[in-house]
């Protein structure tokens, strides 16, 4: 199979950009969040039923993939178009060697000098087509700006509504700061009685890096053992131990 045309390369990238067979993960590449995958997953996506169906309907845009060499040619066209770039996933120790800060949630990726197209080699998507959500976001921003500029023309009931909403928002912020101060006072007072447990916390996950609802669960806890970050760290330890045992 000859190298796909530029139009075919774009069509294939659009089709496979969010394909489930890629089993994409998110990582940090050049200080930004990106999607990355293994080369063998891309080959699997090209051999999927979804791609085969497209290939039958539009063979000029989606060339048939009958061998690994065909998949290789398609992938090379994506590299030449700079839709994907080879990368190396760094471990924590390697991050420090390259002056990068290890991240608990997202692995750090480093640009590779060559693409060998090995099954377990990592590749990063640099192609990010615009989605409907992106267009809706732009439209929403424009509508919001125009609505704000036209505030003097708003009817009285809308102005009253925005006033009450702003008061409610300020009240919520005040309640949040109030809870933060109360929990700190309770913690300091509890150290004398339960210092061996690390102190008593109301809403131990209040300032943790988690969702809004999770920030208020559980209602109370002792020390850091009820914290979201501590529990997440313990889960990672158990997973790593399980992998080593396998």
Swiss-Prot record:
Subunit-structure text: Part of a complex that contains SEC61, SEC62, SEC63, SEC66 and SEC72.
Name of this chain's protein: Translocation protein SEC62
Residue pairs linked by disulfide bridges in the UniProt entry: none
Role this protein plays: Required for preprotein translocation.
Location relative to the cell: Endoplasmic reticulum membrane
Gene Ontology cellular component list: endoplasmic reticulum membrane
Keywords: Endoplasmic reticulum, Membrane, Protein transport, Translocation, Transmembrane, Transmembrane helix, Transport
Transmembrane segments: 135-155, 169-189
UniProt KW Cytoplasm keyword: no
Chain ranges on the Lumenal side, renumbered to this chain: 156-168
Keyword Iron-sulfur tagged: no
Pfam families cross-referenced by the UniProt entry: Sec62
UniProt topological domain (Cytoplasmic) ranges: 1-134, 190-246
Family, per entry: Belongs to the SEC62 family.
């Amino acid at each position: 199979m000859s190298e796909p045309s530029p139009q075919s390369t774009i069509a294939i990238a659009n089709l496979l950009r969010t394909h489930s067979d890629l089993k994409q993960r998110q990582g940090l590449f050049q200080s930004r969040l990106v999607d990355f995958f293994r080369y063998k997953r891309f080959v699997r996506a090209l051999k999927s039923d979804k791609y085969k169906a497209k290939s039958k309907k539009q063979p000029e845009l989606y060339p048939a993939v009958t061998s690994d060499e065909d998949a290789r040619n398609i992938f090379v066209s994506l590299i030449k178009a700079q839709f994907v770039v080879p990368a190396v996933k760094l471990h924590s120790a390697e991050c420090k060697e390259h002056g990068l800060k290890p991240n608990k949630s997202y692995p750090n990726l480093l640009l590779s000098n060559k693409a060998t197209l090995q099954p377990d080699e990592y590749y990063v998507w640099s192609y990010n087509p615009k989605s409907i959500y992106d267009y809706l976001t732009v439209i929403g921003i424009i509508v919001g700006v125009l609505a704000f500029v036209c505030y003097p023309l708003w009817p009285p009931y809308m102005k009253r509504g925005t006033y009450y909403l702003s008061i409610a928002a300020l009240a919520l912020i005040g309640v949040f700061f109030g809870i933060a101060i109360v929990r700190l006072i309770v913690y300091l007072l509890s150290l004398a009685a339960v210092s061996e447990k690390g102190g008593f916390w109301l809403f131990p996950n209040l300032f943790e890096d988690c969702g809004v609802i999770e920030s208020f669960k559980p209602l109370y806890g002792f020390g850091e053992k009820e914290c979201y970050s501590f529990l997440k760290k313990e889960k990672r330890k158990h997973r790593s131990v399980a992998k080593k045992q396998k």
